Amino acid sequence: SAFVSPRTRNSVTPGLTTEKVYGIDASYNLRYGDYKLRVSGYYTKVYDRSKVISFYDDVLKTYTNFAMSGIDEQYFGLEVAASIPIYNGLSLNGAISWGQYTYTSNPNYVQIADNSAEPLSSGTVYWKDMRVESTPQTAMNIGLSYRGPHNIYASIDLNYYNNMYLSMNPLYRTDEVLLPTMTDEQIRELRSQEKFDSAYTLSASIGKNFYIQRRYTLGFSLQVNNILNNQNI
């Protein structure tokens, strides 16, 4: 985030600098007849990312912008996918993705009043080695797909997700919220990161394509997600 509060002023995020991204990935693809296999690995480092979170501070009783700079992140993982033919257009498909996404620095921050642009506090956000939020870092899929005559196709898939983390409140990971009476255990609990439970969904789809004069394609499809109505997601 380059601007602290783009809707009210033209101030840039303190400590803003060029964000740098370095990465490497490798893939191996194997195809033997209708059998398919793909294996991929990746590693990415991000340096000097900036981020602004806006919220109402109950203690200060004002709407604030929490501007962070110097955020470093690390991403690495492995992905494997395969497709195995079973019989006459029916195939078994599966994929697994495993990754580990972490913050690798303790960024600097400035908390600024939104209305007056007055700096309210500044310091360090202690979240090094915490997990990057909002995306599952482990995911699996297994399903059946069918391609039949007359351009008909159908599929059913079971999806599984795990290692999902809630977005952290960076203010709780600063010295500003600590009290002299707090014990080490209370501080660890305050700064701990919440992890979502694992989740799964079952989905299915069916469709048909029509080719018109070999120049145009008209397709119809129906897809149903979360067939089992799993609400623990």
Where are these predicted regions, by residue range?
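Membrane-embedded beta-barrel scaffold of Gram-negative outer-membrane proteins
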Residues: 15-66, 74-76
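Residues that define the transmembrane beta-barrel architecture of outer-membrane proteins
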Residues: 20-24, 31-33, 72-76, 134-140, ...
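Residues on the lipid-exposed face of transmembrane beta-strands in outer-membrane beta-barrel proteins
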Residues: 16, 26-30, 78-84, 94, ...
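Gram-negative outer-membrane beta-barrel transporters
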Residues: 42-45, 62-170
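Outer-membrane beta-barrel domain signature
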Residues: 13-17, 67-71, 129-131, 192-195
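C-terminal beta-signal and adjacent terminal beta-strands/loops
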Residues: 46-47, 159-181, 197, 201, ...
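Short loop/turn motifs that connect adjacent beta-strands in outer-membrane beta-barrel proteins
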Residues: 34-36, 87-89, 151, 211-218
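Solvent-exposed loop segments that connect transmembrane elements
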Residues: 1-12, 53-66, 104-128, 170-189
